[in-house]
Amino acid sequence: MNRFSKIRQYSTLLQTAEKYSVPTYAKPSVILTKGKGAYLWDSNDNKYIDFSAGIAVTALGHSNPEITKILAEQSSQLMHCSNLFNNEWAPRLQESLVEETLKSGGMKGARKVFLANSGTEANEAALKFARKVGTLSSPDKTEFVNFEKAFHGRTMGALSVTPNPKYQAPFAPLVPGVKTGVYNDPKAADLITEKTCGVIVEPVQGEGGVYKANDEFLQALRNKCDEVGAMLIFDEIQCGLGRTGRLWAHDKVHPDILTMAKALGNGFPIGATMVTEAVADKIAIGDHGTTYGGNPLASRVGHYVLSQVASKEVLDNVKKVSQQIRDAVAEVQEEFPELITEVRGDGLLLGIQFSKDPSKVVAAARENGLLVITAGTNTVRLVPALNIDQEAVTEGLEILKKAIRDNAKDL
């Protein structure tokens, strides 16, 4: 196919997408066709360095050769069987999640895992489990506490604890009995009462603008949950699985329920909800379920991904690259202190706070071969692959700095 035929083909494809896709996303007229490691290519063979990783998903890079091999091999053996039967990979993944978590010092008391297909499903399970535990204690123990700027998903339960009018308003009324506190304010623990069954919080908020929870805040939540018998849920769908340079973003304070997804499948759909023995003991056969969750294909991929993101090599790389990015952004921040006001986050979940809308910077970066995304209000979010190499990082940072310098006066 010659170049002009390809252009016509992909132009037609964009028209097809506009005609047949439910319009839930605003997308640039770029069609991505292949990826390798930290790089992506579009239909015109333009090459991009990916600092978005599919929104913190492709933690081990695009088209990871070992994952590609696993997908081919397992799909030729067994992709799916119902959860009326066991398969050989789901229990292996569940065991590894618990053992690696305990080994890392995360989630004291982690014991059992429910496997699902996505982050929002993992959170739905967490909310249901917390409600079940609560109502066994008291029929009035049904309420939830969440926090400003949180994002927990778009299905009805997860949406109900995502306090953003942009997402919630079209679908009201939502699940009742949800109270919203101020993130990082220990006084928010006062919202937790005898009627509270669950408190859900991100140790590092991603979508809300990349804000890291402090220990005092999380400890206040833990103390009040213990006092009233509520379940503390940590949503680590974006910030977990090595993204902070530790297996889990939480450190000194530990949850009753931990949710994860995104990086666990490196692009293949999977989610998981890990619970303590005390929670698992309250869940009976038939209380919850899933058609595809825990299928052997997703579970085998997840088993491999976990072995890599928990490794010292990958976690050390996260810390090294994080500092490299911070140093580069600090250089530009010195030039434009009124434009770049702060760099937030942890590991390779970083947010560059602009005083003005940075959309021109994002567009300029893309035009010059770097993909970055936004979060919250005027925040550019950087979430590259955890195993990104030095060459790609250096090249990407040069493009980012140029995009900022070239557009600083026009923002």
Curated annotation (Swiss-Prot):
GO BP term (any one): arginine biosynthetic process via ornithine
Name of the molecule in the record: Acetylornithine aminotransferase, mitochondrial
Modified residues (N6-(pyridoxal phosphate)lysine): K262
Organism phylogeny: Eukaryota, Fungi, Dikarya, Ascomycota, Saccharomycotina
Any one GO MF annotation of this record: identical protein binding
Pfam families per UniProt: Aminotran_3 (PF00202)
Pathways per UniProt: Amino-acid biosynthesis; L-arginine biosynthesis; N(2)-acetyl-L-ornithine from L-glutamate: step 4/4
PANTHER family: ACETYLORNITHINE AMINOTRANSFERASE, MITOCHONDRIAL (PTHR11986:SF79), AMINOTRANSFERASE CLASS III (PTHR11986)
GO cellular component, one term: mitochondrial matrix
